[in-house]
């Protein structure tokens, strides 16, 4: 009854107006699953490859018709009649059919769309919400939202080098209250920026993109806005950064052009440590470039006991890259982006591997998103305890937050908000 009878892919648009892949899967019993695939702006060199057409006469070369054709052709032929409840078999069949180490032949966007839609169809067939189907009875921890409320770097057209400045409402008793705190601080920040004469346009992920002079300026505005909203920084909420350092690592130096700084790896570590001393920063993502292992080691040795150091470009949700980090003692947390690795099974493996090594995990969106809220369910299913899904603006971001509100409501008194404990004593 749970055999796959139809797979239909189409080209849709993401939140930046670029094409992406959406996949529908239908099972013999009539169960249906739909998934839309996200896309990143700053991408790691070691990520699985999303397939784009390259035809400049359509969408500037960013069309995904070839990936859609791969789903409707080869992948449908290979998976027709296969039991949707055997997720790992399905994912392995697609990986084998692709035949490349980075899913570049069929496209990670084609493979992931099918992988997630299959899981959703199987969940519907089982009469379970996706988070329970994937995570079982232990899926009850609501994640701390890491809310990106000031954007810089590749996500905004301003002189700030660091890509994301986030608030983590760790002091709330529930996810719903955490979301309220985030929204109140977000609106307070808008007022503070406006009062200071800054623009309040938003970047790709819904955060503000003001023309501030430095990272310190951005952090000071956020702390001020939080305290004006009645919340205490360092207690009710803490701060997080996504440095996206790979984006400005050139010829062995970290080129902070907005601040007029050119730093070697040791100086970059000192720069980040200085920010963490001055502000309640408890999470730093991609503080060093993806292949600057020596720099990562310096950063981990200096800050790893008091700050969560998240590897995004460093690990690209890939167990092989994570193993390098574990062997070398790099970072202490992994960012989980389903489209970096390209299947649900491999995503689960990456989270399991991280948790076994006492690393934390953060479920994450991409800057090019859709209304699909799968990652909200996966954050709960995999007990990540943290989720990065943008700001408190743009419906593509709010879709995930609103789904988490529904999950918390459905879990009722079984729901647990991860809170400060998820940062492991930091």
UniProtKB/Swiss-Prot annotation:
Chain segments carrying region Disordered: 38-60
Q: Which cofactor does it need?
A: Mg(2+)
Which UniProt keywords are listed?
Answer: Cytoplasm, Glycolysis, Lyase, Magnesium, Metal-binding, Secreted
- Superkingdom of the organism of origin: Bacteria
Localization, per the record, is:
Cytoplasm; Secreted; Cell surface
A biological process (GO) annotation for this entry? Answer: glycolytic process
Identify the pathway: Carbohydrate degradation; glycolysis; pyruvate from D-glyceraldehyde 3-phosphate: step 4/5
Q: Where does Mg(2+) bind?
A: 242, 285, 312
- The answer to whether keyword Magnesium applies is yes
Where is it predominantly found?
A: cytoplasm
Q: Which GO terms describe its molecular function?
A: magnesium ion binding; phosphopyruvate hydratase activity
The family this protein is said to belong to: Belongs to the enolase family.
Protein name per its UniProtKB record = Enolase
């Amino acid at each position: 009854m749970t055999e796959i009878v139809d797979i239909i892919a189409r080209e849709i648009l993401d939140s930046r107006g670029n094409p992406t892949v959406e996949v529908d899967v239908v099972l013999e019993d009539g169960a249906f699953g739909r998934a839309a695939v996200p896309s990143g702006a700053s991408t790691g060199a070691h990520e699985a490859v999303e397939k784009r057409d390259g035809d400049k006469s359509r969408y500037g070369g960013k069309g995904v018709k070839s990936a859609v054709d791969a789903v409707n052709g080869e992948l449908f032929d290979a998976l027709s009649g296969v039991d949707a409840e055997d997720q790992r078999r399905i994912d392995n069949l697609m990986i084998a059919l692709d035949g490349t180490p980075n899913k570049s032949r069929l496209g990670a966007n084609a493979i992931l769309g099918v992988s997630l839609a299959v899981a959703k169809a199987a969940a519907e067939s089982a009469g379970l919400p996706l988070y329970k189907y994937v995570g079982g009875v232990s899926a009850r921890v609501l994640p701390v939202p890491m809310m990106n409320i000031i954007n810089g770097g590749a996500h905004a057209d301003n002189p700030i080098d660091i890509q994301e400045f986030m608030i983590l409402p760790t002091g709330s008793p529930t996810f719903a209250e955490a979301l309220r705190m985030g929204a109140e601080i977000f609106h307070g920040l808008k007022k503070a920026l406006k009062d200071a004469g800054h623009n309040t346009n938003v970047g790709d992920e819904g955060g503000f993109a003001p023309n501030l002079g430095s990272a310190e300026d951005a952090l000071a505005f956020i702390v001020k806005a939080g305290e004006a909203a009645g919340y205490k920084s360092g207690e009710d909420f803490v701060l997080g950064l996504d440095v996206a350092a790979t984006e400005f690592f050139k010829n062995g130096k970290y080129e902070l052009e907005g601040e007029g700084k050119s730093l070697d790896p040791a100086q970059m570590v000192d720069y980040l440590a200085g920010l963490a001393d001055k502000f309640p920063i408890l999470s730093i993502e991609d503080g060093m470039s993806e292949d600057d292992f020596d720099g990562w080691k310096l950063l981990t040795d200096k800050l790893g006991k008091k700050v969560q150091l998240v590897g995004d470009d460093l690990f690209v949700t890939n167990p092989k890259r994570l193993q390098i980090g574990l062997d070398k003692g790099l970072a202490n947390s992994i960012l989980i982006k389903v489209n970096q690795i390209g299947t649900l099974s491999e995503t689960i493996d990456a989270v399991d591997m991280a948790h076994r090594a006492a690393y934390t995990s953060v479920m994450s969106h991409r800057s090019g998103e859709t209304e699909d809220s799968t990652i909200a369910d996966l954050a709960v299913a995999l007990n990540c305890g943290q989720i990065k899904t943008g700001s408190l603006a743009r419906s593509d971001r709010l879709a995930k937050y609103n789904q988490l509100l529904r999950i918390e409501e459905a879990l009722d008194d079984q729901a647990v908000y991860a809170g400060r404990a998820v940062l492991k004593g930091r």
